[in-house]
Curated annotation (Swiss-Prot):
The lineage of its organism: Bacteria, Pseudomonadati, Pseudomonadota, Gammaproteobacteria, Pseudomonadales. It comes from Pseudomonas paraeruginosa (strain DSM 24068 / PA7) (Pseudomonas aeruginosa (strain PA7)). The keyword Chaperone does not apply. Binds 2 manganese ions per subunit. GO terms for biological process: glucose catabolic process; glycolytic process. Monomer. The gene is gpmI. This is 2,3-bisphosphoglycerate-independent phosphoglycerate mutase.
Amino acid sequence: MTATPKPLVLIILDGFGHSESPDYNAIYAAKKPVWDRLLATQPHGLISGSGMDVGLPDGQMGNSEVGHMNLGAGRVVYQDFTRVTKAIRDGEFFDNPVIASAVDKAVAADKAVHILGLLSPGGVHSHEDHLVAMAQMAARRGAGKIYLHAFLDGRDTPPKSAQPSLERLDATFAGLGKGRIASIIGRYFAMDRDNRWDRVQAAYELIVDGKAEFTADSSVAALEAAYARGESDEFVKATAVVPAGAEAVRVEDGDAVIFMNFRADRARELSRAFVEPAFGEFPRQRAAQLAGFVMLTQYAASIPAPCAFPPEPLTNVLGEYLAKHGKTQLRIAETEKYAHVTFFFSGGREEPYEGEERILIPSPKVATYDLQPEMSAPEVTDRIVEAIEQQRYDVIVVNYANGDMVGHTGVFEAAVKAVECLDTCMGRIVEALDKVGGEALITADHGNVEQMEDESTGQAHTAHTCEPVPFVYVGKRKLSIREGGVLADVAPTMLTLMGLEQPAEMTGRSIVILD
């Protein structure tokens, strides 16, 4: 006979960070006797939910998708931006086999390496650091002809801010003693995603045929002329950069083309124009026989080209591992965060695992959640208490949306009410667990509600924060909490409490030290 499950409940308080400052801190201002009692009597600490600790760039605030992915995966899940940045820092980028293969083929035949990408510090579709590294890699591997075809931003950056980026790349090439910027064009053309193929055609013909509406003898002169025509970065028309005595650059047979955008959606159309044998969206004057066309990441599985950083499938995430061990689990949230405790917590998988059940509680239909700061938390709690009392599940994962969704409204009084409602809900869960001898871990995915005003502007602060998040053990065991934890350590902690061995794929470390 199997033992009756005494559930381990993971309570994720969305947007519930920790700030030492009491100013405009809805958690500090709220009446929260249950929370205060837990912090006074139960082992607790703080863990990181932002920046490189969750696979985001340094200093980047966390978000719900990334937070739940890390919580469920039991390892830091690096986003594409940080995977590439980390590879450059570690030096691995410069030996990337997919890029190296294309570059080396071109070098062996004394052909050119063409670098395409959004030249921008924006960090949304690309980062100029990555383009600099690519130019350095091509030079290191012996390329004599290195050409950058720069797409200008102005959407994820100010509308007229491209000049420092162009100057930086000019300086990079000068330092290498080879290579140059060959063309500039706005992202409006090169990075269309709405099947406006006439725009993509302008970019393709500029890069492949050197066909341009305008020419200039330097990248900065090209930009200045565009500004004089009334164009901002995003809308700069096709311009070939042709220094005195040179010709417009073309893509020739045997050249290598490396597309350095890491975000897929706006890189697909131009990539298809380069590599699809039966491409028919616009007539190509010429389709060069390339030594290689490389996508930095997989823009689409259907595009016939290799990628330098293929998707990393997440295996043995918490849900999958529990299912393999015959454990039952319940995922529960209201509509606003239901995808987070299911799809994202399961590492990007839609289907439930064997032994997994799900409960979706509808979110209230109000214009903004400051009008109903309790949201559907009481109804969510009703179902959790019922599930605990039934003792049917080994693990229950619940998300409470209030801290984040009410925090986003910027209404301080509503945020305080949201925290007070959460406190009542936690009290009910703790009481139910007490009766059956269950345990809970309380944490958050990122901060928000602990900072409701931006002190520098005096305006409401509606965004997430980089603050650490609480980690509280609720139960009868004697244990201590180690410092320096991150969200990726939560799943290994749950396995420790359940007496299950941690799978090799989970590289996080348990936060609890059992006495």
